[in-house]
């Protein structure tokens, strides 16, 4: 099967069922490297702690995860693009990005990139869809398309994502009793990709080991990203990104004109110390600000 036909099949599965699985996105050595490095980040950085209703409880200081399991079931490191070239490779991965683009279009954006570590004993998440914050009639065109790369084998016992196939086409949110989800059991290194309208949940982790993963979420180019990467990633670092990654975090244009600076993409100004348009009108702007 050619790459284009494989991508077409995967995009078709997302359209029909709301999700698909891409096998062997990471090999065993890469899984081990990401797992070791994300553990290092959890030791060295403040971590986001959240409970299974997806309520963020706050930040834990480096190397310390509170033991009060009533308060939290998840540990996350946000904005992974700040933490090394291995993470820069994830949003542009050749097995992932073509599928995302097939769902959202070439003008899509990276919404966020983070670790998602479900702790032992975590209870199941509530049934939810990732685009429920948008006040739009359902079903609607795909607004979000998300990828989760397993850093261990995902099983029904350790918190494998449970999906309700076809629910991305439902006209309204479900009411209790909620439908039972189908566990998507995948191997370490595989990726689950789903339409943001798909109703799903992370099952309870009934084991004594964490269930680590990498999450790479995308949105169409005309909605707001969850993480403001234009401000949170230093420009000096963005200059080192490959051009496609620069576009994905917001330095490109949507439909050839949205997000522009002087009718040019923001990436054109990454190497400029000052914006040429501002140079031309600096005195006038300063006067206007004083007024």
Swiss-Prot record:
Belongs to the PhyH family. One of its GO terms (cellular component) is plasma membrane. PANTHER family: ECTOINE DIOXYGENASE, PHYTANOYL-COA DIOXYGENASE DOMAIN CONTAINING 1. GO terms for molecular function: 2-oxoglutarate-dependent dioxygenase activity; iron ion binding. This is Uncharacterized protein Rv3633. InterPro entries: Phytyl_CoA_dOase-like. Gene3D superfamilies: q2cbj1_9rhob like domain.
